[in-house]
Each structure stands twice: as structure tokens, then as C-alpha cells.
């Protein structure tokens, strides 16, 4: 156990001192997940495992960097833990579904799906009603904007040097005294840089969730309950019935309509509302609508583009092969 602790401490130090290398590692792991897909048997499961690992790696590294930059999330420790667990569930849900189907068959797969959706609904209800977290975002913990954060840290470290410079009264030139100059190797041959603070960064760090009234709370509750109601409808009416598709769509549209009346949203909440509006288009790709109407048209369009538009085939043909697999995964479609 002590050995694992030392290894983790070394890894934390590595991330703190080399954030660019950590980002490169995350990108490499994610690219590896794309390269694995379709290469051999069970490649889709392994590809999804690697992709989930890349997301968890980003979550871990962001947590390390936030501590190093003193950029803690504006909430209690218990709320942060709930958000972290919710993020982990969202990152691994597809792989867990695929693994359950492989190990325990269709019955085990649906049991795992129901358990994950119940766990997510419980966590979101706690965040909504106990912690008053407002509109739930996805992912629950927004990834750290490392470029702006690290740039802000560099500017803070140079603040003393900036204070020691002065501006000539007549010429208006910014002059740095010789005593405050850095070493020759790290010297910059330009004007001292001014401290820049990103408005978006400050808003993201310090803005509190927009308080929800009764109407908005009902709307968000509908959004949280939608997956469970959809699963219950699937169990009662069957996979080929239109009723689960219609019920889910009505709940999502109702929730979105009630929330769209809110005006004073912060930046993250506005982004979440745009994401939810875009995800309404997913109903064109969800069965039974996809099976009866969308499938033939989408495949025809992809085949036409692959045959007649140079270069598009590199993307269109793998997409045509992957669409049937994508349709079989619940969390790809309905998660």
C-alpha cells in the first residue's frame, strides 16, 4: 500500500510539473482507443475501455492541477464527491454495459443499465434538492481549461516583476530596472507582460448556480426522471413500441420548454441548454424512428458521399460499419 502511495505521489508531482506532458498522455490514450476499434475480436469493448480510461485520466489530472493552482470548485467537499462519482458513472457506463452484455447476456446488460440509471438519478436528485445545484451539466465536472489557467499562474508569478517596472512620464515607455531582470537564458526581449484575467475563466470559477423556482425545479426533475420512465416504458411496452420513444421525447421537450424561460443563466448553464437542444436531434437516430425512417436515408447519404466526394470515404465507410453497433448500445443512444 505504501508503494502505491509513493507511486501516486510521484505521478502527482509529474502532472504538476509537466501539465503539457500530461495532456499529451491523455491525447495519446484517447487516440489509441480510435485505432483499436475494429482491429480484432472484442476490439470494440477494449476500445471503449481505453476511451473510458482516457476520460478518467483527464478527471484525475484536472483534480491534481486544480489543487496545485488553488482552483478548487466553488462548493462543499461532499458535493464535489457526488459530482466526481456522477462523472465516473458517465465515463464508464458504455463500457460497463458492453462488458455486462459480454459476460451475462442481455438480461445482465439490462440489469446493469437500470442500476446505473438509478444511481445517476439518485445522485442528481441529491444535487438538485439537497445542494441546490441548479441545472445539471454534462459532464458534471467541466474539464479544466488548462491553457488559460496555467497562463494565469504564470502571470501571477510575474506580478512582482511587473510592479517593479515603471512608465516614463514623457515617453510613456515601460522600463524594467536592471536589478529585476531575469537570467539571460529566460530573458524576454519585449515589454513586461500585463496580467490578463479571462472573464470566462473567472465566471466559471466563481459563478454560483442560478436559483430554480418551482417551475424550473419541476422541469429539471422531469429531465432527471426521464431515463427511468423510459426504461419502465420499455419494460412494459417492449422495444418495438412507439410509446417509450414518444414518452421520452415529450418529457425532454417539456423540460426544455420550461427551462428555456429562464433568462439569467451563467455561461455553463447556457452551454448545457444548447447541448440539450442539440441532443433532441438524437431522436432521429433512436429506435423505432431510426429503424423505420432514418436508417435507409442516412446510409444512402453516407454511401453517396463515400463514392462521389474525394476523401469523405475515409470517414463515411467506417461510420456505416459502426452504426449498427452504435444502435445496439443503450447508453450511446439514450444515456
From Swiss-Prot:
Topological relation to the membrane, as annotated: Multi-pass membrane protein
Region named Required for peroxisomal location: 66-81
GO BP, one annotated term: peroxisome organization
Biased composition (Acidic residues): 155-164
Transmembrane segments: 81-101, 110-130
InterPro entries for the chain: Pex16
Keywords in alphabetical order: Membrane, Peroxisome, Peroxisome biogenesis, Transmembrane, Transmembrane helix
Region (Disordered): 146-168
Record bears the keyword Cell membrane: no
This protein's GO CC annotations: peroxisomal membrane
Topology Peroxisomal: residue spans: 102-109
Compartments where found: Peroxisome membrane
Chain ranges on the Cytoplasmic side, renumbered to this chain: 1-80, 131-335
Pfam families in the cross-refs: Pex16 (PF08610)
Keyword Transmembrane attributed: yes
Main function: Involved in peroxisome biogenesis.
Family: Belongs to the peroxin-16 family.
Protein name according to UniProt: Peroxisomal membrane protein PEX16
Species in which this protein is naturally found: Danio rerio
Higher taxonomy: Eukaryota, Metazoa, Chordata, Craniata, Vertebrata
Gene label: pex16
Amino acid at each position: 500500500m505504501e508503494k502505491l502511495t509513493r507511486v501516486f505521489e510521484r505521478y502527482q508531482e509529474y502532472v504538476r510539473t509537466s501539465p503539457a506532458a500530461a495532456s499529451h498522455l491523455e491525447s495519446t490514450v484517447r487516440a489509441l482507443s480510435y485505432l483499436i476499434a475494429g482491429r480484432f475480436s472484442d476490439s470494440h469493448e477494449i476500445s471503449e475501455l481505453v476511451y473510458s480510461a482516457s476520460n478518467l485520466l483527464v478527471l484525475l489530472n484536472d483534480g491534481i492541477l486544480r489543487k496545485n493552482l488553488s482552483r478548487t470548485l466553488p462548493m462543499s467537499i461532499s458535493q464535489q464527491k457526488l459530482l466526481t462519482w456522477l462523472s465516473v458513472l458517465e465515463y464508464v457506463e458504455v463500457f460497463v454495459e458492453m462488458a455486462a452484455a459480454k459476460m451475462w447476456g442481455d438480461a445482465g446488460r439490462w440489469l446493469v443499465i437500470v442500476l446505473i440509471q438509478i444511481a445517476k438519478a439518485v445522485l442528481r436528485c441529491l444535487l438538485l434538492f439537497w445542494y441546490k445545484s441548479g441545472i445539471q451539466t454534462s459532464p458534471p465536472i467541466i474539464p479544466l481549461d488548462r491553457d488559460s489557467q496555467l497562463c494565469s499562474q504564470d502571470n501571477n508569478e510575474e506580478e512582482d516583476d511587473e510592479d517593479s517596472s515603471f512608465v516614463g512620464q514623457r515617453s510613456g515607455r515601460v522600463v524594467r530596472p536592471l536589478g529585476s531582470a531575469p537570467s539571460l537564458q529566460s530573458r524576454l526581449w519585449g515589454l513586461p507582460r500585463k496580467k490578463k484575467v479571462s472573464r470566462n475563466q473567472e465566471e466559471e470559477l466563481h459563478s454560483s448556480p442560478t436559483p430554480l423556482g418551482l417551475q424550473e425545479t419541476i422541469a429539471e426533475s422531469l429531465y432527471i426522471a426521464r431515463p427511468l420512465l423510459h426504461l419502465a416504458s420499455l419494460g412494459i411496452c417492449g422495444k418495438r413500441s412507439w410509446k417509450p420513444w414518444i414518452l421520452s421525447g415529450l418529457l425532454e421537450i417539456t423540460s426544455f420548454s420550461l427551462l428555456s424561460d429562464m433568462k439569467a443563466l451563467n455561461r455553463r448553464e447556457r452551454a448545457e441548454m444548447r447541448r440539450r437542444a442539440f441532443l433532441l436531434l438524437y431522436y432521429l437516430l433512436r429506435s423505432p424512428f431510426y429503424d423505420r425512417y432514418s436508417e435507409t436515408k442516412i446510409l444512402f447519404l453516407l454511401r453517396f458521399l463515400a463514392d462521389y466526394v474525394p476523401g469523405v470515404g475515409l470517414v463515411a465507410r467506417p461510420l456505416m460499419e459502426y452504426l449498427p453497433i452504435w444502435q445496439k448500445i443503450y447508453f450511446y443512444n439514450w444515456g
